[in-house]
Swiss-Prot record:
Mitochondrial methyltransferase which uses S-adenosyl methionine to dimethylate two highly conserved adjacent adenosine residues (A1006 and A1007) within the loop of helix 45 at the 3-prime end of 12S rRNA, thereby regulating the assembly or stability of the small subunit of the mitochondrial ribosome. Also required for basal transcription of mitochondrial DNA, probably via its interaction with POLRMT and TFAM. Stimulates transcription independently of the methyltransferase activity. It comes from the Eukaryota. This is Dimethyladenosine transferase 1, mitochondrial. NCBIfam families: ksgA. Keywords: DNA-binding, Methyltransferase, Mitochondrion, RNA-binding, rRNA processing, S-adenosyl-L-methionine, Transcription, Transcription regulation, Transferase, Transit peptide. Pfam families: RrnaAD. GO terms for cellular component: mitochondrial nucleoid; mitochondrion. Disulfide bonds: none annotated. It comes from Mus musculus (Mouse). Its main location: mitochondrion. SMART domains: rADc. The gene is Tfb1m.
């Protein structure tokens, strides 16, 4: 991905600094919400540059907070910037930015996990999935507490071509806890290789752009932060329903230090577990003694394809949840323990 060499020609007028905005409105980061403010405009400008050219692009910023990255985006000559902020304390500071950039900044008080963006931008900017990405870009300094559920939600949106991806293969430039960023780009065999690696990489081209030291944030988090760029692929590397892929991958990685047959076995009811797991691995041509971290995307493609066929043969298989079976067994065991006849009374 080629990064834009410089920010756009539009410049905001002189404004209070982000630090002054924080002081002016009495803002403070809420630890329970994993809030950390990025005050250095050189770093926010770098995030925007690494996102690529945003000239005449419709940008959706999630969690703008006091507006550090927001300023850098506005200075990139965007067509329009839509920000969605859940915390009402930040709205007055963002409104100040909106007043300084008439017609450029739209503020929505809402939750990014539930906000419907499908009709937020003009319909004429939509592109076919096979075409180049549309002039829409998602940018955000994500709170650690929502980053993983949010990216999983967006990955499912990609698979369905809905949500932010009704416009086409919308690009994303997002911050994550460094460990999460490393998992998103991890290669087969690395210790960071995980469920998140497979789920992201089967649907997107994923690039870890750079790392921001924790000391750059206020308050300083205990970890560094990674900036990640994701571009949806024209064709997913696994052509099965998202929920099916997610189920196979989740089960495979739940016992990441054991052989892969251990976790994959949890896809099947106990009565048929040994036989069905053996059949799955044999048909997928996978060594049952491989560790989950050594299962590649192509391994998971084979596993998902075979598991889909097994589900087609036995439709109840897809809805099977080993935790539910375990819960039922425990419940029956407790009932038996409490039965007077079973206790000899």
């Amino acid at each position: 991905m080629a990064a834009s060499g410089k920010l756009g020609t539009f410049r905001l007028p002189p404004l209070p600094t982000i630090r002054e905005i924080i002081k002016l409105f009495g803002l403070r980061a809420v630890k329970q919400l994993s809030q950390n403010f990025l005050l250095d405009l050189r770093l926010t400008d770098k995030i925007v540059r690494k996102a690529g050219s945003l000239a005449d692009v419709y940008v959706y910023e999630v969690g703008p907070g006091p507006g550090g990255i927001t300023r850098s985006i506005l200075n990139a000559n965007v067509a329009e910037l839509l920000v969605v902020e859940k915390d009402t304390r930040f709205i007055p500071g963002l409104q100040m930015l909106s007043d300084a950039a008439p017609g450029k900044l739209r503020i929505v008080h809402g939750d990014v996990l539930t906000y419907k963006i499908e009709k937020a931008f003009p319909g004429n900017i939509r592109r076919q999935w096979e075409d180049d990405p549309p002039n829409v870009h998602i940018i955000g300094n994500l709170p650690f507490s929502v980053s993983t559920p949010l990216i999983i939600k967006w990955l499912e949106n990609i698979s369905l071509k809905d949500g932010p991806f009704v416009y086409g293969r919308t690009k994303m430039t997002l911050t994550f806890q460094k460990e999460v960023a490393e998992r998103l780009v991890a290669t087969t065999g690395s210790k960071q290789h995980s469920r998140l690696s497979i789920m992201a990489q089967y649907l997107c081209n994923v690039e870890h752009l750079f790392t921001i030291p924790g000391k750059a944030f206020v308050p300083k988090p205990k970890v560094d932060v990674g900036v990640v760029h994701l571009t949806p692929l024209i064709e997913p590397k696994i052509k099965q329903p998202f929920k099916l892929v997610e189920k196979v991958v989740q089960n495979a990685f739940q016992f990441r230090r054991k052989y892969c047959h251990r976790g994959l076995g949890m896809l099947f009811p106990e009565a048929q577990r040994l036989e069905s797991t053996g059949r799955l691995l044999q048909l997928a041509d996978i060594d049952p003694t491989l560790r989950p971290t050594h299962l590649s995307l192509m391994h998971f493609k084979s596993l998902c394809d075979v598991y889909r066929k097994m589900c087609d043969e036995d439709p109840q298989l897809f809805t099977y949840n080993f935790r539910e079976e375990l819960k039922q067994k425990k419940s029956k065991g407790q009932e038996k323990d409490g039965d007077p006849e079973s206790c000899g009374f």
